Amino acid sequence: MAAAPSALLLLPPFPVLSTYRLQSRSRPSAPETDDSRVGGIMRGEKNYYFRGAAGDHGSCPTTTSPLASALLMPSEAVSSSWSESGGGLSGGDEEDTRLLQLLRTARDPSEAFQALQAALPRRGGRLGFPRRKEALYRALGRVLVEGGSDEKRLCLQLLSDVLRGQGEAGQLEEAFSLALLPQLVVSLREENPALRKDALQILHICLKRSPGEVLRTLIQQGLESTDARLRASTALLLPILLTTEDLLLGLDLTEVIISLARKLGDQETEEESETAFSALQQIGERLGQDRFQSYISRLPSALRRHYNRRLESQFGSQVPYYLELEASGFPEDPLPCAVTLSNSNLKFGIIPQELHSRLLDQEDYKNRTQAVEELKQVLGKFNPSSTPHSSLVGFISLLYNLLDDSNFKVVHGTLEVLHLLVIRLGEQVQQFLGPVIAASVKVLADNKLVIKQEYMKIFLKLMKEVGPQQVLCLLLEHLKHKHSRVREEVVNICICSLLTYPSEDFDLPKLSFDLAPALVDSKRRVRQAALEAFAVLASSMGSGKTSILFKAVDTVELQDNGDGVMNAVQARLARKTLPRLTEQGFVEYAVLMPSSAGGRSNHLAHGADTDWLLAGNRTQSAHCHCGDHVRDSMHIYGSYSPTICTRRVLSAGKGKNKLPWENEQPGIMGENQTSTSKDIEQFSTYDFIPSAKLKLSQGMPVNDDLCFSRKRVSRNLFQNSRDFNPDCLPLCAAGTTGTHQTNLSGKCAQLGFSQICGKTGSVGSDLQFLGTTSSHQEKVYASLNFGSKTQQTFGSQTECTSSNGQNPSPGAYILPSYPVSSPRTSPKHTSPLIISPKKSQDNSVNFSNSWPLKSFEGLSKPSPQKKLVSQKSSDPTGRNHGENSQEKPPVQLTPALVRSPSSRRGLNGTKPVPPIPRGISLLPDKADLSTVGHKKKEPDDIWKCEKDSLPIDLSELNFKDKDLDQEEMHSSLRSLRNSAAKKRAKLSGSTSDLESPDSAMKLDLTMDSPSLSSSPNINSYSESGVYSQESLTSSLSTTPQGKRIMSDIFPTFGSKPCPTRLSSAKKKISHIAEQSPSAGSSSNPQQISSFDFTTTKALSEDSVVVVGKGVFGSLSSAPATCSQSVISSVENGDTFSIKQSIEPPSGIYGRSVQQNISSYLDVENEKDAKVSISKSTYNKMRQKRKEEKELFHNKDCEKKEKNSWERMRHTGTEKMASESETPTGAISQYKERMPSVTHSPEIMDLSELRPFSKPEIALTEALRLLADEDWEKKIEGLNFIRCLAAFHSEILNTKLHETNFAVVQEVKNLRSGVSRAAVVCLSDLFTYLKKSMDQELDTTVKVLLHKAGESNTFIREDVDKALRAMVNNVTPARAVVSLINGGQRYYGRKMLFFMMCHPNFEKMLEKYVPSKDLPYIKDSVRNLQQKGLGEIPLDTPSAKGRRSHTGSVGNTRSSSVSRDAFNSAERAVTEVREVTRKSVPRNSLESAEYLKLITGLLNAKDFRDRINGIKQLLSDTENNQDLVVGNIVKIFDAFKSRLHDSNSKVNLVALETMHKMIPLLRDHLSPIINMLIPAIVDNNLNSKNPGIYAAATNVVQALSQHVDNYLLLQPFCTKAQFLNGKAKQDMTEKLADIVTELYQRKPHATEQKVLVVLWHLLGNMTNSGSLPGAGGNIRTATAKLSKALFAQMGQNLLNQAASQPPHIKKSLEELLDMTILNEL
């Protein structure tokens, strides 16, 4: 019976064939007696209780067996039999009389059952009623048929107790067998699993006592019943009754097996035959081969043939050991007994008994976890064809129960086992569809990402095997589940299936009516999911077939809460957007969930659908999703999806009557120009999930005709169903090589091309997810031009690229909103773009890749496959190139869909470099616009013009690795792209539309534009620092990503000396850069794949040079850039001069090729050499240049610092102390100009920070990136937070604690680059958030002070800057306390000690420190003045004190490393202070000795010594209070750790001692309140030890009584806001008590601090009163705080609540009403 509950829970639903209702008959001639009234209660007056006769139990058979008919007598007959058998109530004993009287007068049978149940113990477990027992049994049987669920449960419980009281000996009473056994068998078909279980347990007890009668009843009333549901239930549950113990009694199962075998020949009810055959299999497994064969041999020949035929069709040659039968009967000799024993040891025929027992071991979770792992291995060898149906059902039942396990690993492993089982079953899973879905539904409410991924795999596999409609039919039965999360996930799975499978696979009308009730669900999330589902349904139905959809909506709108749902659905459809699938298969909603009516993001337009969502109950939960991402803002089904995109796809349809997902017919533009932009606009980066169908493996040959085949692409890939064809989506490939190896595999090879539709914009646009592209190609120029509404891409005929890039790892980043540019292509490749004014702003996008060039001699000219949009070009003089306007491009400009992931970028071959067009502005002006034309002709000399180009010889750079890892190439070459890209974005403000940051740049292609006179330092740089003649008339713009400065790739960059290793001093740079995509939101701009330094005797028209810091720099001057006079008449071969008058944008760092400008004027042709830059190469270069770099660097440092140190030497100690905070101008200037030391490749400069257009989404993405294990992503996330702090501080403040915690964790990161980026991020947080960081000082300062002991100079330097920013911006009092608490106590006091030396220190305190904090600061200063700084602690020596800055080569001295230089001076100051301290009357030696003693005891390793120290401290506080008060900070700094000691005894003693000391010390505790409260509260109020919890509560209460409550206000507010569990409740209640006492004295401060906590509690509290992630019910505490504030503030509280989101005000009003009602 152990397995009975599990199997019962998974009974498949059987159809209700008929209903049965007992009809009452009346006898008018019979007078109504008391007994008949009892029957009347059970018959008529009990209709309220027994209305299940036609409802709950309407599936009873229409006709019953004769035995049942005889038993189910009218109630009058029952009552009369009671009267007759009793002979009157007076004839029974007194107890029977009382119970009978209760049955007469009870309002319902449940009271009678309870009375009978209570009487059982007094009767020794016996029922009594010796003369009325038969009538009683019949009445109970009537209840089992007619009664409601509760009555049946009570009746079965009573019968179970009675049978257990009678024991197992002896036969069943005849009355019991006749009256109750048939009704118990009928109960086996109950829908309620609990009732089935109880009935089965009673039958099991009866089977032991009267097996013959029970088996006969099971056959007659169950297996041979006219009710098909009852027959199936009996057959399914019968094997469960036949346990091993019962079989040992020698039960004769002949009739049972014959009855089951009869059903095998019934072909009309195949399902019933299958159930019967499964029952026989399970019985055979339990009987063993010998006994089962004996039963089968006794079957009639016809039945035996049916059985053998079924056996062969089911198992074929693989017959289980207990079914190994000959066709004509049985073998004479059974199989060896050993086989039987070994196989009988298998539970469910699958798993060993020992493993089964360990799976159910509730004592040791590790044992269960290991057992689940072993179960996976067992299932890997499992053959479903050799396992009986019933065994598999039992096995699924086991998995069903395991999914209830409290251990996550067990649940996750069980899901994996279930998934593996579904895979192994294949198409056979259809037989077990119900149980598998029932088990899977159990975990739908789980919000963990891995759980979501696992059950999505299960459902998708089920849909693949049996079709989506069958799965959804069973799944939608759970749409009324009590858990709203389950309901939401059910709808989401429906959306996923609709987006994955064609509409022909669904019954869309039925699906619409099934999903419609979710539209009026009480929960917002379910409503939103339903709206998204209806959008997909409308898409699947088409525009002309949506009437059924609206009929379904009409049906639910008529409900009580359905008013407005039709408007909501129509508004949702009018948005013309569809949800889509992410990489993991989760659903990403198109419309975000508005958190409140006033807090919607500006990108979400107000509408009836959003109002409908807001009308639902708020059920916000903790956001992990994403982080668990923030589901309210992200709405990615699965919440923790790394692919976050809030830009939704616009519809291609323009007609008013068209739905957003309708296909557009291809239009004709120009000559045979197919427009695909309408289709492509519907696609976005994550519409393309990784799939083997969309990847080309590495090494796949690509030829001229390579393109996607015409096959249907499921909707999870493309939002419209348009097929890809060679006309729309070709892969350009051809050239001199016959085949080409294209690298297209790797992780997350997402194919997105919403970016290539010709739109530009910021985060809100489709272009925000641009990445990098990769291909391998030699000797080919490639360029890309996107014309108006024309879908084009770049790529030559031997390359396969994508116009939008790939991030280095899965996911995409959201970048700040920057203006974007649209650089043109070369007139030698495409004639100048001429675009209409209307389309120019949105649709002119150009991408250019630059790859190194060897020579273009001999390269065949590719034939274009399409006509292209032409451009109008003009030379620098304004003369139009008419002959070029008809040219055709050398490459096909249509979208290429395949791209390789950035993580596997490589340089196995060089890549074509597009020449920059001459006479075309790379950044369009706002003035003139042109018209659209077409190219007619392609010049023959295009492929000959670069003939003379030769690369610069860089062979001496010693790059010996020719087969560099492709994965390394991507990240190292990113830096040049980013540094230039960010600078141009910074400079593009003059030409961007200031009114709309998301708008694209306006085009201007005429040379008469006023932009021609723009500053050279703006228009002289292409995106990667490329300088060309054309760039003299261009402006630049791009979107910066995390900064990667070239100085870390070429360590000699910057203003430092730049020795060259080039062999020839007579070289010219020809072309070494690459333009990034002109779209404005690239998380990782296109990478430069390689460099090619070429030389020419004279720069050609299309030649470019790299400029930037250090290009023509010298030892003594900052790098300069070329002005417009740099290049003069290079067309004629003239030499050019350099003008070093203009500073380039900071951060554009080029390669300093030569220090002498004249070396560029004489050029020789030399052998070309390509340089492939990668991570490994970059490290090698730095290694080889290390000595050289350090040599120049140290010389420069020493030269510049020499005067500084000398000036410092003559300055007074106080002046030196102040200067230690601010380095000299020379040092500062030097550090600013030394990017290799002060800037890492990933950290963005302050000047490069830009605002986000969607800061809420960016914040969520930043937290997700910080949680990623990839260190580069962590740095990206830190840069995001810096941007948010600079421009969106109000958004950042909403999650400041969570963000700060994440940043602090990265400060501890072992990778120095990440650690340093986190320190810089903290510095910016202090700078921009100012006093908002007060609450976070304890954690941030502690980690910064710890980090100050690092050996890396640059980290110490940044830590100093961060601490300086902290001191300058946060509340001074909090800063001082945090510094003292930060672990570096001596140095914290030392900083305050230095500040005291300032002559205006007290004035500054009074000016900047709030009056309420001023007394405490002055007390701290006074203590320092009296006692001095003290000696440096011997037990915690400073790491910096042991370090010598002169011993570290290449270190840049800063304030942190120059402390040793001040050492002697500081000691002098200390000695002066010590002299002052000696004048204090207290014996300083005694005080120091006492401190050493007491702190030694408090910090002792032995817990007994620590307890003695605590007791000693209490004794000293009582007897020598002055000594303790004089050293209170130092003493309690050691004592606070004992308040949360790991030893519970020490912890408890410390708390009790603290409780006693508080009344003694009282206000003397004020300097240490901020350190005490966290130590008292954080762990202790959540302690499971009742003693510790009570002691902590007493300490908090004592603090409230004896310490100024104003000092407690801020710490209590902080703890009430950020603690969780019981501690949060307690601190909130204490805060309410403080408000009551403090408000009259400090009203403004109380409101300022406490209201923040109240809004936090009200805003995050769910309907159940709990907080996400906090645990426990906070409603009562919140109500108390609300009441306290309302009592003090009155109506003003409600007025201030009106400025908060509506749900906060609503919650406040509800709580206030609740408290008022409670008082009444």
UniProtKB/Swiss-Prot annotation:
Region TOG 4: start-end pairs: 1484-1720
Region (TOG 3): 1256-1425
Keyword RNA-binding: no
A single GO BP: microtubule cytoskeleton organization
Main location (coarse class): other
InterPro entries the UniProt entry points to: ARM-like, ARM-type_fold, TOG
Cytoplasm in keyword set: yes
Superkingdom classification of source: Eukaryota
Region (TOG 1), start-end ranges: 94-312
Disordered, as annotated region: 794-924, 970-998, 1067-1087, 1430-1462
Comp. bias (Polar residues): 794-809, 819-829, 842-852, 868-877, 1073-1087, 1446-1458
UniProt KW keywords: Cell projection, Ciliopathy, Cilium biogenesis/degradation, Cytoplasm, Cytoskeleton, Disease variant, Joubert syndrome, Repeat
Assigned GO CC terms: axoneme; ciliary basal body; cilium; cytoplasmic microtubule
Region (TOG 2) location: 352-596
Subunit annotation: Interacts with ARMC9, CCDC66, CEP104 and CSPP1.
Function, as annotated: Involved in ciliogenesis. It is required for appropriate acetylation and polyglutamylation of ciliary microtubules, and regulation of cilium length. Interacts with microtubules and promotes microtubule polymerization via its HEAT repeat domains, especially those in TOG region 2 and 4.
Domain remarks: The TOG regions are composed of HEAT-type repeats that assemble into a solenoid structure. They mediate interaction with microtubules.
Entry's disease: Joubert syndrome 37: A form of Joubert syndrome, a disorder presenting with cerebellar ataxia, oculomotor apraxia, hypotonia, neonatal breathing abnormalities and psychomotor delay. Neuroradiologically, it is characterized by cerebellar vermian hypoplasia/aplasia, thickened and reoriented superior cerebellar peduncles, and an abnormally large interpeduncular fossa, giving the appearance of a molar tooth on transaxial slices (molar tooth sign). Additional variable features include retinal dystrophy, renal disease, liver fibrosis, and polydactyly. JBTS37 inheritance is autosomal recessive.
Similarity comment text for this entry: Belongs to the Crescerin family.
Entry protein name: TOG array regulator of axonemal microtubules protein 1
Organism: Homo sapiens
Gene name of this polypeptide: TOGARAM1
